Amino acid sequence: MTGTDDGTKAGTRGPARASGPRVPAPWVRTRLRAAPAAALALALLVALTAALAAAFPRAVDRYEDAGLRRTLDDASPRRTTVQFFAPRPDLELSLGEGENALREAALRKGYDAVLAAVDKPLVADRAQSSYGVRTSDPTDASESFLARPSGLPPRVALVAQNALGAHSRPASGRLPRATDPVTATTSEVEAAVTTETARTLHIKVGSVIHVPGLERAPLAVRITGIVAPREPDGAYWMSTPLIREPSLIQLPSDGGTYWIGALLLAPDAGPVLLGTPGKPERYWQVAPDTSGPTAHDVSGLASAVAALESGPGLARIRERVDPLTDATTDLDEVLSSFTELRSGIAPLVAVAAFGAGTVAAVVILMASGLAAERRRGELALVRARGGSLPGVLGRLLAETAVVAVPAGALGLGAALLAVPHARRSSAVAAALAVTVLACVALPVRAAFAHRAVRVHGGREDIASVRPSRRRTVAELTVLVLATAAVAALRRGGTDDAGSSGGSGDQLVALAPVLVGVIAALVLVRLYPFPLRRLAGPAGRLRGVVAPLSLARAGRTSASTALPLLALLTALTTAAFGGSVLAGVHTARDHAALLATGADGRIEATHALPTALPGRIRDTRGVREAVPVSVAYRAQARRGSGTAGETAALVGVEPGPYGQLSRELDLGGFPARTLRATGPGGSGSGSGSGSGKAVVPAIASPSLAARFGTAPFSVQLEDDSKVTVRIAAVRDVTPAVTDLDFLVVDREALTRRAARPTALLLTGGHLDGAALRRAAGGGVDVRLRAEVRTAYVHSPLQSGAERIYTAAVAAGAGYAVLALLLALVRAAPERSALLARLRTMGLTRAQGRRLLVLESLPQALLAAVGGALTGWAAIRLLAPGLDLTAIAVAGRPAPGGTARLRTDALSLLVPSLAVLVVATGVALAQAWWTGRRGSVRELRAGDGR
């Protein structure tokens, strides 16, 4: 045997290779090392998409939670507090037992029982909740020092509420005490009043107020202190506002006014109320904790409130406290208003979310398709050498998952950090969906491409490939879904969608996306026909660029459905979303215009000072100030014996007021419509007020329908009369809103009635502070911009608008990415083509034109198709979309329902952007190819 002792063969270097099977290189590691840039690009795409997908539901949760808190905070504690009350103890009880039932210990026991009946997610705010005993029927107080605005004695309620010292601080004197056990026969008790009550009713420390007794002498209530509430707007004081400040009561038929106030007794002085005729009652007030509930808890909150009002919770309270205990609250109505607003906004946000999500999904599929196309030869070779389809797909899934799963987790973590304090379940589900799609897209695409073992396949030119039956069936299925969604939205609208829930609502939200999908499929079907028709004539054209570019466009790969789908979906969503946002802004601006009648409005209940119009015109930003006189309670009637119709009679100067109406498009009219004789129109008010002369008037439709064109009489609030004849009918007029109106020339009115009570201001940048200084006190100054801002009150509105804008922007970004992916996919073939054509004499300028003209047909198809699809989607879906909820948030707003209208900028700008990007990328590719040279692209055996 020849060799060495260490087992090496003679003449060799190093040890001999070990015998046995060879260990193959790990597939995943090898592939990642072979294409690190592609792996990094996929990781970035998955991380970004997962972050956006996870952030969306959390952002929605955050603005909905903020909207719920704003709704609860805006509602007064009197509405949100759940109040339980029970009458005086059973008359069958002894006097001592009845007195014990009104002492603080017994009330505290009932309070604990009430709190125990509160079910989650409703949580009581113990710091602001209260209990006690009070007289439900205030009694007269005859002391002469008390305030009597019209000579009537004030009335006082006796209230013994817990924790008075913890919720107030003495402004003077001390808190009331109950040193000895108080009974129904106690002759004198101590009490405190709030600073507001003391100031209004003229009460001082040491004052004694006598309250009538029930079968006993009057009860003397000595004021020992005046207290200032620590949290005057808290539920402790505002659940029953009377204990904080008195209320002025107006008797009917001008019977006078009187005050009602509250005297705050010591918490353990409740038994004394049994000796008064004030009908004492026990009460327990549960203030909800408004900081804890989320929008996700609204249905549970409503159920908990219903249980306390008339359900199992109230039954438990009656069992443990008193069988006659009853409950009342408006918290259910507050929650219902929030739910209604959210239901009106959520479907609109869902439309944007589905649009952006669809485009993002298409981009991920395109990225996977690009990877599959890049590795077509490799995978075909593996299959030809015996690789099984499941084995190949499993390895593709593994190498994709190694990149996508960490990237998805990174995107989820970024979303959780960027949008804190919201539910995680929806975010995790969204990020998981993105990750799964990224993992399976490449294997599924490879499975369809390599079902059969083949090395070379035929060309799939868009102008020659015929759609398969499966594709036809799939397209017809999508067409049916889109038709159903559009029909459902037109029939039921987003209001029904937001309130019913379920898969039908998701189908409605998908309607714009499905319209874009159908348009993409139709355009892909139609696109080859003009290319086939133009192929012959193009060959007879002079020059090489035009026929070659058309031939290249016709030989584009048939797999253009995904890029076109992404572009059309993004363009449709952008046009639809832009029109929604433009419609919201237009609706707010129009509602604010109707509410003010101009850019600004200065109005008083009395005649304005004579010098005020001049001062206002001199204020910075004011272009014109049009004076008008408005009598809101004028009575229009035909004949003296007929019932009057209340209407607002507006006296105007026909010239300036008519011009203002025309400029604002609020029922414009020529000045001659209101002039009975000649131009005139000084507005001095030279009418006699007798109503003999007939003057022309502009009327609202309802008045015109009732009175026609015959003259009729109008009586003003100062008893003067004017006889008018309706000369024109207008739906709106700047001076009044949501009222029947008659507009006449001020010259026909008496001097008193013609004095202006309002000024309608125009100007681009009105200064509210300067106008208020110039107007002085006693007048109301309203600006159109301020009213418009007030319509954006709920975080539901502002949050939904931000989310909608972000979704549209994300969809546009993904559309650009889809366009770039489509161009990148064709980049190697285009580079090789340019290199070969340059060897044949093609100039650089011709190369640039060739690439631009080659990419222009598809870009032009997407741009024109996107604009038309967006327009069609808006026209189809507008009847079912109500923008009122997101525009004015349920606030009283004139102008009726806000409907979706086409916005030209939203249609044209995205489409033009597609053309610009496509042209720019083609020019950049031509420039870069020219810099690199042609040697690398002219390799022998290249199959491109």
For each feature predicted by the language model, list its residue ranges.
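Hydrophobic alpha-helical transmembrane segments that constitute the membrane-spanning cores
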Residues: 355, 398-423, 726, 810, ...
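Selective detector of the "anchor" transmembrane alpha-helix that sits immediately C-terminal
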Residues: 350-370, 803-825, 857, 861, ...
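Juxtamembrane segments of multi-pass membrane proteins
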Residues: 492-678, 691, 696
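Alpha-helical transmembrane segments, especially those used as permease/efflux helices
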Residues: 9-11, 37-41, 49-55, 274-279, ...
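Short beta-strand boundary microenvironments
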Residues: 138-201, 624, 628-711
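Actinobacteria-biased recognition of intrinsically disordered, low-complexity terminal regions
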Residues: 1-30, 319-323, 640, 679-690, ...
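Membrane transport/envelope proteins' first extracytoplasmic loop
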Residues: 1-360, 424, 494-509, 522, ...
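Interfacial "coupling" helices/loops that link adjacent transmembrane helices in transporter permeases
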Residues: 31, 362-401, 818-860, 939
